[in-house]
């Protein structure tokens, strides 16, 4: 069994004494740092590698913290100017994950890089902490690598903002196999197709 397998098993038992102590120490360290900061190396190398990270030039890791809880509707003085059914401000549940939010914020900070993937590293009562894997599309080491040079294509700019990363696709309900045919072509398109009555006229 390789070293990464042992790391994976350690991470799996998050309630063990070792991991609980380690997480407490790490979360204290993360709290002292900026909201978005660059990490020298991945905290979970086994997870990062499974998501596509390589310890070579052109790959960058950023760590980010996102506030936990609901998303408050940004309206001045709580005035939504609508019907009572739509007047909620506080108890609204954001339809995307905090991980997707983390990716988007890092993507805005490092606009010259492309977001490849991300993963959870820690959490406390107030924040969740994620590490985001970014790739430099201008770097020769990436452009010459047949496995990764697809991300250099301009259509992959800000893929995290368009729900094209793994967590973005998950919140869009996009996957393969049984039960996933209801989100074909997107949520709104599916709703429109299923709620539009179309009566075809046939002429001889």
Curated annotation (Swiss-Prot):
Region spans: Disordered: 165-185
Main location: cytoplasm
GO process annotations (BP): cytoplasmic translation; macroautophagy
SUPFAM superfamilies: Ribosomal proteins S24e, L23 and L15e
PROSITE patterns: RIBOSOMAL_L15E
Similarity comment text for this entry: Belongs to the eukaryotic ribosomal protein eL15 family.
Function according to Swiss-Prot or TrEMBL: Component of the ribosome, a large ribonucleoprotein complex responsible for the synthesis of proteins in the cell. The small ribosomal subunit (SSU) binds messenger RNAs (mRNAs) and translates the encoded message by selecting cognate aminoacyl-transfer RNA (tRNA) molecules. The large subunit (LSU) contains the ribosomal catalytic site termed the peptidyl transferase center (PTC), which catalyzes the formation of peptide bonds, thereby polymerizing the amino acids delivered by tRNAs into a polypeptide chain.
Subunit structure of this chain's protein: Component of the large ribosomal subunit (LSU). Mature yeast ribosomes consist of a small (40S) and a large (60S) subunit. The 40S small subunit contains 1 molecule of ribosomal RNA (18S rRNA) and 33 different proteins (encoded by 57 genes). The large 60S subunit contains 3 rRNA molecules (25S, 5.8S and 5S rRNA) and 46 different proteins (encoded by 81 genes).
Name used for this protein in its record: Large ribosomal subunit protein eL15B
Source organism of the structure: Saccharomyces cerevisiae (strain ATCC 204508 / S288c)
